[in-house]
């Protein structure tokens, strides 16, 4: 059987799964609230993937075209993501292995290689969205040409190198700071634009009438596809193992509960950010007659004159930059997890980062060079289509494994959880395949 050669093990950042496993101690005699604080963190790293520029594009278009009416789709998509991420975390805590490694152990080599390639493709697609978002942020904030901004994003490998010697908790703190930056920017934006909050609250109630036409249904599926990230399912099952958990059933049950709370709180932050983007677009654009804003550049261009202050545009750019940079770390971690889990292969983290970014830079450069600055919107759509296509291949083994009593024991999915999970699999798979077909059909 062909095996990839092992490469030198030279860690340069706290990203290699086997090196950070069990690095955060949680003494059993700690008070519950201190245990919760020690356990908080993995959910934050996962939540970053739910705030990438692909989400921005779909939320902005939904808000500008249909006002607040699709806000409930953001809510339901986030709830679906919470269910799947809780399953992923439980798998990692109970088995002590991540989804990629378990897939390697339980499936045939050919199927494992296909899974690995598809998962790597999803990371590159996500990184493409980050490249475009950061390049656009450099353009909006500093006036750098889009192509120049794309080139600047290659320097984020230096950020990974700069984390040499940092521990995993410091990495989580950095990501938390970036998430808070995004949240603060949108808090100020909403304070400036002053949306109609009763209408916002009413839009949280599901309204199937809002999806009766083809166009809002298309956008709703786009929101769903942009919200649930496939590589996050691999990521979460691994990084929860940074917490030291006793192998006794009560200790694992407590860890599962703490992880569930961490996941819900962290993804609620992502929900607030995505909801704020849609609400801002609805209040600033839809309410003022600009119902054709379909990309991030147009949103930034119109925001300042509508709000009446240059601060609005600056905050928008800062939040976009923070969203792109925060995913630098999680993309690198997820890549290491895939290589170590599927292939038993470890390489220096900066090399891993450089390889992923190089693959993402190629379509970004070609697209912008050939189609101009407005290619960003099209490329973001393509990145979300790729992510949507890969998602079922990550969901299926996750749901199947967490429902396997031989593997999970008493922690296996109950009937209700299994029913909800398989329904989500069916709905998300059909929705994403329909979205892929619509995009390919033009």
UniProtKB/Swiss-Prot annotation:
Function per UniProt = H(+)-stimulated, divalent metal cation uptake system.
Which Cys pairs are S-S linked?
Answer: none
Source organism's superkingdom? Bacteria
| Annotated GO MF terms | cadmium ion transmembrane transporter activity; manganese ion transmembrane transporter activity; metal ion binding; symporter activity
Q: Name one GO biological process term.
A: iron ion transmembrane transport
**Compartments reported by the entry:** Cell inner membrane
**What gene does this protein come from?**
mntH
Family indicated by similarity: Belongs to the NRAMP family.
Protein name as catalogued: Divalent metal cation transporter MntH
Provide the primary localization: membrane
Residue spans making up a coiled coil are none
- Which HAMAP family does this entry report, sorted A to Z? NRAMP
Query: From which organism does this entry originate?
Result: Ralstonia nicotianae (strain ATCC BAA-1114 / GMI1000)
């Amino acid at each position: 059987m062909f095996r990839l050669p092992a490469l030198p093990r030279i860690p340069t950042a706290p990203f290699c799964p086997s090196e950070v496993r069990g690095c955060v101690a949680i003494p059993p005699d700690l008070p519950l609230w201190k245990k919760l604080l020690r356990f908080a963190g993995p959910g934050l790293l996962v939540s970053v993937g739910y705030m990438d520029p692909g989400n921005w594009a779909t939320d902005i278009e939904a808000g500008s075209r249909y006002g607040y009416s699709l806000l409930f789709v953001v809510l339901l998509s986030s709830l679906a993501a919470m269910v799947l991420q809780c399953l992923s975390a439980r798998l990692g805590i109970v088995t002590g292995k991540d989804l990629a490694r378990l897939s390697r152990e339980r499936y045939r080599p050919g199927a494992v290689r296909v899974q690995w390639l598809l998962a790597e493709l999803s990371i590159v697609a996500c990184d493409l969205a980050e490249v475009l978002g950061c390049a656009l942020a450099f353009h909006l904030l500093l006036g750098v040409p889009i192509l120049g901004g794309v080139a600047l994003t290659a320097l984020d490998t230096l950020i990974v190198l700069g984390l040499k010697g940092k521990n995993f908790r410091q990495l989580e703190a950095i990501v938390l700071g970036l998430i808070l930056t995004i949240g603060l920017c949108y808090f100020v934006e909403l304070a400036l634009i002053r949306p109609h909050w009763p209408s916002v609250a009413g839009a949280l109630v599901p309204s199937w009438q809002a999806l009766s036409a083809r166009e809002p249904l298309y956008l709703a599926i786009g929101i769903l596809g942009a919200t649930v990230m496939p590589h996050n399912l691999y990521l979460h099952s691994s990084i929860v193992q940074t917490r030291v958990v006793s192998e006794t059933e009560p200790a694992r049950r407590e860890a599962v509960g703490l992880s569930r709370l961490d996941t819900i709180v962290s993804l609620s932050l992502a929900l607030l950010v995505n909801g704020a983007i849609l609400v801002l677009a609805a209040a600033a654009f839809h309410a003022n007659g600009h119902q054709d804003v379909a990309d991030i550049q147009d949103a930034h261009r119109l925001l300042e004159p509508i709000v009446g202050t240059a601060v609005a545009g600056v905050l928008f750019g800062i939040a976009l930059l923070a969203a792109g940079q925060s995913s630098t770390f999680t993309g690198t971690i997820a890549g290491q997890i895939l290589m170590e889990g599927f292939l038993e292969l470890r390489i220096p983290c900066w090399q891993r980062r450089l390889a992923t970014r190089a693959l993402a830079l190629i379509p970004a450069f070609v697209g912008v060079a050939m189609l101009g600055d407005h290619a960003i919107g099209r490329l973001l759509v393509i990145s979300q289509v790729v992510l949507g296509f890969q998602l079922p291949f990550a969901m299926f083994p996750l749901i199947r494994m967490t429902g396997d009593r031989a593997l999970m024991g008493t922690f296996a999915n109950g009937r209700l959880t299994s029913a909800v999970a398989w329904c989500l699999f069916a709905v998300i798979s059909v929705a994403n395949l329909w979205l892929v077909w619509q995009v390919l059909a033009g």
